[in-house]
Amino acid sequence: MIDFLDVQKETPRIRIAIDRVGVKNIKFPLKIHDDFAFLTLNLFVDVPADRKGADMSRAVESIQKVINAGSYGERIGDIGIAICDEALSRFNYSEKAQCEVNIQYYRRSGERYLEYRMYVETAKDRKQIMKNEIGISYVTMTACPCAMETTRALISMDNPDISDAISAIPTITHNQRNVTKLTVDNRSKMITVWDLADVMERVQGKPLDSLLKRVEEGRLVYSAHRNPKFVEDVVREIAYEAARVLGVPDEATIKVSSESDESIHPHNAYAEIDTTAGELRKLHLH
């Protein structure tokens, strides 16, 4: 029997502890009931100063075991905690583990699949969960309120006999695809990524669909124009709604970003909020 040298276990020439050692871009497909998901994962542990390297295969094994053993369903956002726990059980010389998961998720909706992006970022030591953020993003549609009011005024000037009617209905404006992302601190493990999707849908509706029949297309456009929004409106409304309906502690962070692919400009419009549930709950709307 060959006695292989454990090189990783040797003492390094330069004794400096390393904060993050591990694997990046591990890819896994996952089927959840009628849905499909494609996961890209990073997993890191710390390595003490007196150890040359980490056992990289243990990181891959930690990911494989959790994914192959679990049926997550609604709780797919908990996958980071499970992987960190598994890693800490295998890396006996490490004190903390960090896991990052990007998920391309296709959710069955009738005969169609709606596309979501999900995000999990977890950091855990042997005593506590230090970080567990879950997030979701998808593509929607926004209509510009500024251009709408400008065209309303122009139409009324050109057609004074119908100005009263014009003031009561949505008018012409430019619209664009918009990507909105909501991320929430879930160390309390009280919410799921689908709770975040529900918050987004209250403000932005469901993700855009490749297949739209004539009436569906008309309703989508009409809905966006009945409720035109700047990217600033989008992030404010989603942040406020998240704090209102999600049962997370006051200290939980809530981050919202919104980016519109502007149809009349060669640039994008962007807005971002980074605050806490407690700060948002202090607001009194008028």
Curated annotation (Swiss-Prot):
It catalyses: GTP + H2O = 7,8-dihydroneopterin 2',3'-cyclic phosphate + formate + diphosphate + H(+). Its cofactor is Fe(2+). Keywords: Hydrolase, Iron, Metal-binding. GO terms for molecular function: GTP cyclohydrolase I activity; GTP cyclohydrolase IV activity; iron ion binding. It comes from the Archaea. GO terms for biological process: tetrahydromethanopterin biosynthetic process. Its EC number is 3.5.4.39. The record marks 144 as: May be catalytically important. Binds 1 Fe(2+) ion per subunit. Pfam families: GCHY-1. It is an enzyme of class 3 (hydrolase). InterPro entries: GTP_cyclohydrolase_FolE2/MptA, GTP_cyclohydrolase_MptA. Pathway: Cofactor biosynthesis; 5,6,7,8-tetrahydromethanopterin biosynthesis. PANTHER family: GTP CYCLOHYDROLASE MPTA. Homodimer. Converts GTP to 7,8-dihydro-D-neopterin 2',3'-cyclic phosphate, the first intermediate in the biosynthesis of coenzyme methanopterin. Belongs to the GTP cyclohydrolase IV family. This is GTP cyclohydrolase MptA. The lineage of its organism: Archaea, Methanobacteriati, Thermoplasmatota, Thermoplasmata, Thermoplasmatales.
